[in-house]
Regions:
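A beta-strand edge to alpha-helix "cap/lid" segment located at domain peripheries
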Residues: 54-60, 68-141
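Generic detector of well-ordered alpha-helical segments enriched in charged/polar residues
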Residues: 8, 23, 46, 125-132
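A solvent-exposed, acidic/Ser-Thr-rich amphipathic alpha-helical stretch
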Residues: 19-20, 27-72
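Bulky hydrophobic/aromatic packing residues
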Residues: 21-26, 36, 77, 109-111
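Short, mixed-charge, low-aromatic patches
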Residues: 1-9, 32-35, 49-53, 138-140
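Short acidic-aromatic low-complexity motifs
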Residues: 1-28
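Soluble or luminal CAZymes and related metallo-dependent hydrolases
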Residues: 2, 6, 44, 88
Length: 141
């Protein structure tokens, strides 16, 4: 599906100056969800991306794999950047549904916010690490 490849290229080159082109790739009522956001509509999605660029420097989004089944694409990716002076990398997967017109109508990002984000925060991270150790199988190293 050429639309999936085009959206992939758009995401891999996403930058503040490319946000005006978002409407070429998503429907006006697009539904976007990730561990921090659940928004509907082009303007709401644009604000999510604007907020990301306001908060994160040196953003890099790389798609490692793209699979298609009809109107649904599954994308494995890596997102990296610098937040408050600290470099980070997130590994995740997206489920993307395309409308009959070939634009994205749903984009759901899945990634482990507990181990890839929250555990790096001073107070919450210690608490999550403690809880994880308490409920983990005793055979884990």
């Amino acid at each position: 599906m050429k639309e999936a490849d085009a959206y992939r290229r758009y995401l891999e080159t996403l930058a503040p100056e490319t946000l005006p082109q978002l409407s070429q790739y998503v429907t006006p009522d697009v539904h976007f969800m990730d561990p921090f956001n659940d928004v509907r509509g082009l303007d709401a999605l644009r604000r999510v991306f604007e907020d990301m660029f306001d908060s994160v420097q040196d953003v890099v989004f790389r798609v490692d794999a793209l699979g298609l089944d009809g109107s649904v694409a599954l994308m494995s990716w890596q997102f990296s950047g610098v937040l408050r002076g600290r470099a980070f990398t997130l590994d995740g997967t997206s489920k993307i549904r395309f409308s009959e017109g070939g634009r994205v109508s749903e984009h759901f990002d899945h990634w482990d916010s507990a181990t890839q984000f929250y555990t790096h925060l001073p107070v919450i991270g210690s608490l999550l690490s403690f809880v994880r150790r308490r409920i983990a199988s005793p055979d884990q190293t």
